[in-house]
C-alpha cells in the first residue's frame, strides 16, 4: 500500500453551540501527526479550538498539544485534565510536564462525575492509565483507549492490551462502560476503534 492505511484516530472534534471541542490532540507534528492538517480541512485553525479534553497522558494523545519547538498549539483553548492523571506518575513524565506548564494559565483539573463546559460529562475509565477518562456529550461516548481491539474486546472485555497499566481496573472499566453505553443507547467512539 503506497499510501498506507489509517489505523487509529487520536483526536475527535465536536462543533457545538458555536464552540469547537477537541478530545485529545494526537501525536503532534514532531511525530508526523495529522491533526492540524485534518482540522484545516474542516476550516478550523488551532486558535479556533475552545476546549481540549484530555483522556490520558500517553504521547499519542497529548503529543499534539505542543509545537515541535515546545510552544502551545491551541493558544486560546481551555484545557481539562483528570486530577488522578495529573497526580499519577504519567503526570510527572517529561511530555506531560511540558504540556501542563505551557497550558498552566488555561488548565482546569476535573474529577470523575464533573460536568465540564458544553455539558460534557467526565466518566471514570481508569485502568489503561491511572486517570484515564471517557467523555459523554449527549448520546456520544468518547472512550479514549478503553479498547484497542474492538472485535476481540467487545465480546471479551476481560482481554487486555499490553498497554493497559492496571489490567484488573481496565477490565472493570470496560465492563462497566460497555454496560453503561448499552443501557443508555450511546454511540461509542474510541481512539483505536473502527469508524
Label every model-predicted segment.
Residues 32-80:
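Active-site metal-binding motif and surrounding structural segment of the metallo-beta-lactamase
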Residues 22-25, 50-60, 80-82, 124-127, ...:
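Active-site neighborhood of phospho(di)ester-bond hydrolases with catalytic His/Asp-centered motifs
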Residues 1-41, 134-146:
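Conserved beta-strand hairpin/beta-sheet module of binuclear metal-dependent hydrolase folds
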Residues 130, 139-195:
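Cap/insert and terminal regions of metallo-dependent hydrolase folds
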Residues 29-30, 57-64, 88, 129-133, ...:
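Active-site environment of divalent metal-dependent phosphoester hydrolases
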Residues 5-6, 15, 72-74, 182:
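Extracellular/periplasmic catalytic domains that process cell-envelope and extracellular macromolecules
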Residues 64-67, 93, 154-156:
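Short amphipathic alpha-helical segments
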Residues 41-44, 75-124, 129, 169-185:
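Metallo-beta-lactamase
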Amino acid at each position: 500500500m503506497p499510501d498506507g492505511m489509517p489505523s487509529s484516530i487520536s483526536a475527535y472534534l465536536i462543533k457545538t453551540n458555536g464552540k469547537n471541542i477537541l478530545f485529545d490532540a494526537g501525536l503532534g507534528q514532531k511525530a508526523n501527526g495529522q491533526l492540524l492538517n485534518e482540522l484545516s480541512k474542516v476550516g478550523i485553525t488551532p486558535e479556533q479550538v475552545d476546549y481540549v479534553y484530555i483522556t490520558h497522558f500517553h504521547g499519542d494523545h497529548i503529543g499534539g498539544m505542543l509545537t515541535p519547538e515546545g510552544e502551545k498549539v491551541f493558544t486560546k483553548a481551555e484545557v481539562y485534565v483528570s486530577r488522578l492523571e495529573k497526580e499519577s506518575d504519567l503526570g510527572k513524565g517529561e511530555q506531560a510536564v511540558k504540556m501542563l506548564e505551557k497550558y498552566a494559565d488555561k488548565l482546569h483539573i476535573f474529577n470523575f462525575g464533573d460536568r465540564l463546559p458544553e455539558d460534557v460529562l467526565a466518566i471514570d475509565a481508569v485502568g489503561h492509565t491511572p486517570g484515564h477518562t471517557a467523555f459523554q456529550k449527549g448520546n456520544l461516548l468518547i472512550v479514549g483507549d478503553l479498547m484497542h481491539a474492538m472485535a476481540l474486546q467487545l465480546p471479551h472485555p476481560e482481554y487486555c492490551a499490553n498497554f493497559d497499566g492496571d489490567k484488573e481496573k481496565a477490565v472493570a472499566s470496560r465492563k462497566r462502560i460497555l454496560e453503561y453505553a448499552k443501557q443508555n443507547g450511546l454511540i461509542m467512539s474510541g481512539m483505536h476503534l473502527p469508524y
